[in-house]
Regions:
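Amphipathic terminal alpha-helices
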Residues: 3-28, 316-347
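N-terminal Rossmann NAD(P)H-binding glycine-rich loop of SDR-like oxidoreductase domains
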Residues: 37-57
Length: 347
C-alpha cells in the first residue's frame, strides 16, 4: 500500500493515526504467514498503539482471524479506549508483577516494547528492573512464543560520522545506565534464545518519528520558537514511525535461534544543521545554533533491514514537510523532548 508521495500535509490526528497504521503489502504477507495470536507488551508507549492497529489491519486484510492484544498499565484511559475502538483487545497489567504477568493469555507471537528511558537517571534500579530483569520474566512466561523485542541504537555508543552508521556486527559500547541496561535486555533475550531454543529477533531502533513526537519534531519546535538548536549531536537517523512499525511486524517472521539483531533506522545521514535550516526556510524564520558538531554521533546503518523489508515509504524530506505544516497549524505535540542531543547517556 502506497502513501501519497505528493501529500504536503496531514489534516488531523485521525488522518495521522490512519497513515501511521497503514500496513505495507509485505507486512500483510508476513502476518498471513504467521499462525496464532499476537500479544504486544508495553503497548501504551509512543509507537505501540498504531503498531497494534497496523497488526490488526494487516491480519484482517490477510484474511487471518487473530487476536491482537495490547498490554500496558494504561495510565491514559484515552489510549486504552482508542485501541479498543480499533479492534485491539486491551489488558491492564504491571508486567513486573510476576502473578499478573503469568496470568496473561497465551500467544504464539509477542512484540516486546516495554522499557524505561526517560527518568532513568535517579531511578537506576527501576531502569535495570524494567530493561534487564523483566525480559527474563517474559521469556519464562512465553518460552514457546516467537518474540520481536525492541532495543535501541544507543547500545552501539557513538559512531564516527565518516562511517555513516553502526552495523549489527559492530562491537557495542553503551554509554550511561540506560544504554547499559538495554544491552542487558538484549543479553537476557539472547541467553533464553540459546538455552531455551526460543525464536527471537532484537530490533535496534534509531529513531522513529511522526508529527507529535521525535527528533525531527524537536528540531522543528526549536526553530519555530526561534530558540537555539544544539549541535552537540550534529547528525542523526530518523524513520517514519509507520515504516518502523511495518518493519518490526515483519521481523517476527525472521526470529531465530540464536536470536538475531536487526537495525531499524532511516536511510539518510541527516545533519541537524541542515534540518534546522530547512525548517527555517519552511517557517520563514531565522535559525540560531549553539555549540558545534562533533565528529561522532549515535548513528545506525539499517542496510540489512532494507534488504529484508524494503526501503521506507516516507523520506525524511517528506516527513519534515508534514511536521512543518503540522506545527504551523498548531497540531498537538508531545511536551516530552527526545533529548537526542544527550551525548553522555543520561536520560
Amino acid at each position: 500500500m502506497a502513501i501519497e508521495s505528493q501529500k504536503t500535509s496531514i489534516r488531523d490526528v485521525a488522518e495521522l493515526d490512519e497513515l501511521l497504521s497503514e500496513p505495507t503489502e509485505a507486512t500483510i504477507r508476513a502476518l498471513a504467514a504467521l499462525e496464532g495470536d499476537l500479544l504486544i507488551l508495553g503497548v501504551g508507549g509512543k509507537m505501540g498503539p498504531t503498531l497494534a492497529r497496523m497488526a490488526k489491519r494487516a491480519s484482517e486484510l490477510a484474511g487471518i482471524r487473530r487476536r491482537v492484544i495490547g498490554v500496558s498499565r494504561f495510565s491514559s484511559h484515552e489510549c486504552e479506549h482508542q485501541l479498543q475502538v480499533w479492534g485491539v483487545e486491551t489488558i491492564r497489567c504491571d508486567l513486573l508483577n510476576r502473578k499478573s504477568l503469568f496470568e496473561l493469555p497465551e500467544a504464539a507471537n509477542v512484540i516486546y516494547m516495554a522499557g524505561m528511558k526517560f527518568g532513568s537517571t535517579g531511578q537506576e534500579a527501576l531502569t535495570w528492573a524494567m530493561n534487564s530483569f523483566l525480559p527474563g520474566l517474559v521469556c519464562e512466561r512465553y518460552p514457546h512464543s516467537r518474540i520481536a523485542a525492541f532495543s535501541t541504537g544507543n547500545v552501539y555508543g557513538l559512531c564516527p560520522v565518516s562511517k555513516k552508521g553502526s552495523r549489527e556486527s559492530d562491537p557495542l559500547n553503551p554509554m550511561g545506565e540506560y544504554a547499559m541496561s538495554c544491552l542487558g535486555r538484549e543479553r537476557i533475550f539472547e541467553h533464553f534464545s540459546r538455552t531455551g531454543k526460543m525464536n527471537i529477533t532484537i530490533l535496534r531502533l534509531n529513531y522513529a518519528s511522526e508529527m507529535r513526537y521525535g527528533v525531527l519534531l524537536d528540531v522543528a519546535k526549536r526553530v519555530y520558537a526561534e530558540q537555539a538548536v544544539p549541535l552537540s549531536m550534529g547528525y542523526l537517523n530518523a524513520i517514519w514511525q509507520g515504516d518502523a512499525s511495518a518493519m518490526s511486524l515483519q521481523a517476527l517472521g525472521h526470529a531465530s535461534v540464536p536470536s538475531c539483531v536487526i537495525n531499524i533506522a532511516g536511510p539518510e545521514l541527516l545533519s541537524v544543521r541542515s534540518i534546522a535550516e530547512e525548517f527555517g526556510a519552511l517557517f520563514q524564520k531565522p535559525v540560531r545554533f549553539e555549540g558545534v558538531e562533533s565528529d561522532d554521533a549515535l548513528l545506525s546503518d539499517a542496510g540489512r533491514a532494507f534488504e529484508l523489508f524494503g526501503h521506507p515509504r516516507v523520506s525524511a524530506a517528506q516527513l519534515m514537510t508534514w511536521i512543518a505544516h503540522w506545527i504551523a497549524r498548531g497540531g498537538a505535540t508531545s511536551t516530552k523532548p527526545t533529548r537526542f542531543e544527550e551525548r553522555a547517556g543520561r536520560f
